[in-house]
Amino acid sequence: MNLIKDDRCMLAENLVRKAGKLGLDYFNRIDELQIDRKGHQDFVSEADRALEGVIRDGITAAFPKDAILGEEVGYSAGLSDYVWVIDPIDGTTNFVSGIPTWVVVVALVCNSRVIAGFIYDPIMDVMYSGYDGGGAFRNGVRMSVVALSLIHISEPTRLERI
């Protein structure tokens, strides 16, 4: 199966982008956000809930039998072999602090195996996607790794007091 053109994968990419654009709107008016504390250094905002809602609604409309596991709402059982895993704002602490290093993340699982993942950075407008057996992409361009035959380990340098 070519996962890149799979209906679920195309939907995931579209929903992650849509949620990211909504997240950017919230981020640009961060002072107006309702922010709750879930635990020490663990926050949830109305933006987290709204972004997860956009993603959940899109999944449910297109694939009503799929299960969904979201960070904010939790697990919704399904009847198919698919589970969608959602982190609507990965980096909520940064988000609520006005630090522009947060992303929207969705993974697609089939028969207990992760088959695709999508990470969207709306600040930089960069989409990362990866497919089981199909490679990884940045904005649709295949990413590659550099083959290294030897990794050089630097010697420690003593820093003298200035």
Language model features: what each stretch is:
Residues M1-I89:
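N-terminal subdomain of lithium-sensitive/metallo-dependent phosphomonoesterases centered on the IMPase/IPPase/PAP
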Residues W84, V104-V106:
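Short beta-strand motif preference
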Residues V96:
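Glycine-rich, Arg-bearing micro-motifs that act as flexible, cationic patches
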Residues D81, T101, R113-I115:
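Conserved catalytic motifs of the protein kinase core domain
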Residues V106-S154, R158:
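Acidic beta-strand-loop-alpha-helix segment within the catalytic core
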